[in-house]
């Protein structure tokens, strides 16, 4: 019944899965009274999902004007927004300030730029830290690390710069300070957050002693990953939360900072496993390889083409059949990297079969684009009662042409 309700090339999300995951996260950090998750809007900027997560206690991590506007229209404002941006235009700082968001400064030069942009310095403010070098957990890391070389990353301030920023911001009227850092993406290790926490907790204790500022929160940002391959172990958020708690007790509490609130900015972890792209097999091609052409393309899911990322694929109705056929699963873009899978072993695929591409609930639809004049597909929400709700309609040619001047 649900299959008949779904159009071709739809993205569908699991409400129950998202809610239960948000509750597990909240429970894992319940030991910290000020804890708050700011969902990374860039991962899935769809109002129904933002509202759903807000009902579960999550705020919004925004990084652009339109993300701020989406949050506002969802009724999420004030300190329920963390504005973490870089190379930021003045008008975006002005919008964030108007909404009462917590502003996270990416660079020392933004201290004066922010004051010029909004006419003052907020009483509560955050600065992003980049320790430089190469971040490693001292073990073999699984999964595709998008950024684990902070010294080569454009984000954040050096140790000396963040100390100077705190001193200057304090003199300009700031009263509450936060520290933020993001060192690695999609980590499959329960040790990542605890390791990052120790770095930031130690830094906070040092900065408090050096500058005398009141540090009221530490933002661990994102980076907790998901297993895109079935054989990969999932992170255990309860174990992660306990690891962060131990670091908190060992570093912050002895420094007299046992009241510091913890924030996170998880995106992929929150919704990634609970979204799927459904596409139909419409062509087969037999040349030097075996190809299955589907009606979705990289415009619907860019990650395999852009990063070479693996997304598991299920052929609906053939879950128990032997995977004895090797295929490239391709879209119709005029780009040879428009492939969802390369040399993938799957059951025999017949024309008309529905293929489910897994773990597309974050950085999937949101990274879509219109190359070749392709139109973005619809988004659906599988409700807890089993019904399916349209949460974003499919684009039409009229949408595509609307900005053109003929």
Task: Write out the residue ranges for each language-model feature.
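An N-terminal, well-structured beta->alpha segment
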Residues: 12-21, 28-29, 52-56
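Glycine-rich beta-alpha junction loops
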Residues: 129-134, 183-186, 222-226, 268-270, ...
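A non-catalytic, amphipathic alpha-helix used as a structural packing/dimerization or gating element
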Residues: 16-24, 164, 199, 243
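Glycine-rich phosphate/ribose-binding loops and adjacent secondary-structure elements
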Residues: 91, 186-188, 203, 210-276
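Active-site-proximal beta-alpha core segment in soluble small-molecule metabolic enzymes
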Residues: 35-217, 226, 247
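Short, small-residue-biased leader/transition segments that mark boundaries at the very start
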Residues: 3-8
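Short secondary-structure junction/hinge motifs that connect adjacent elements
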Residues: 14-23, 37-44
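Charged (often Lys/Glu-rich) extended helix/loop segments that serve as interaction or gating elements
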Residues: 1, 249-252, 257-406
């Amino acid at each position: 019944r649900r299959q008949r309700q779904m159009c071709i090339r739809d993205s569908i999300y699991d409400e129950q899965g998202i809610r239960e995951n948000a509750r597990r996260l909240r429970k894992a950090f319940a030991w910290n009274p000020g804890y708050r998750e700011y969902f990374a809007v860039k991962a899935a900027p769809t109002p129904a999902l933002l509202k759903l997560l807000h009902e579960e206690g999550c705020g919004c991590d925004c990084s652009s004007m339109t993300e701020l506007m989406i949050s506002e229209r969802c009724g999420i404002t004030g300190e329920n927004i963390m504005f973490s941006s870089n190379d930021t235009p003045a008008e975006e700082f002005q919008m964030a300030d108007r909404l009462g968001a917590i502003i996270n400064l990416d660079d020392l030069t933004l201290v004066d730029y922010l004051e010029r942009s909004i006419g003052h310095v907020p009483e509560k403010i955050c600065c992003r830290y980049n320790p430089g070098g190469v971040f490693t957990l001292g073990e073999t890391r699984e999964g595709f690390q998008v950024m684990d070389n902070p010294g080569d990353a454009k984000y954040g301030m050096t140790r000396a710069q963040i100390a100077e920023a705190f001193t200057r911001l304090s003199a300009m009227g700031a009263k509450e300070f936060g520290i933020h850092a993001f060192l690695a993406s999609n980590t499959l290790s329960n040790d990542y957050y605890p390791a990052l926490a120790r770095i930031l907790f130690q830094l906070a204790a040092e900065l408090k002693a050096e500058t005398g500022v009141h540090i009221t929160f530490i933002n661990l940002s994102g980076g907790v990953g998901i297993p895109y391959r079935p054989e990969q172990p999932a992170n255990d958020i309860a174990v992660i939360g306990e690891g962060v708690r131990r670091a908190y007790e060992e570093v912050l509490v002895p420094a007299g900072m046992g009241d510091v609130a913890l924030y996170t900015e998880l995106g992929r972890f929150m919704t990634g496993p609970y979204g799927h792209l459904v596409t139909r097999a419409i062509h087969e091609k037999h040349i030097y390889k075996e190809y299955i052409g589907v009606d979705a393309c990289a415009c619907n899911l860019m990650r395999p083409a852009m990063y070479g990322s693996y997304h598991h694929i299920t052929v609906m109705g053939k879950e128990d059949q032997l995977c004895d056929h090797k295929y490239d699963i391709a879209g119709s873009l005029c780009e040879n990297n428009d492939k969802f899978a390369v040399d993938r072993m799957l059951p025999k695929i017949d024309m008309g079969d529905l293929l489910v591409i897994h773990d597309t609930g974050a950085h999937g639809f949101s990274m879509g684009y219109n190359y070749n004049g392709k139109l973005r597909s619809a988004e659906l929400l599988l409700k807890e009662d089993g019904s399916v709700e349209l949460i974003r309609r499919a684009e039409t040619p009229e949408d595509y042409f609307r900005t053109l001047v003929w």
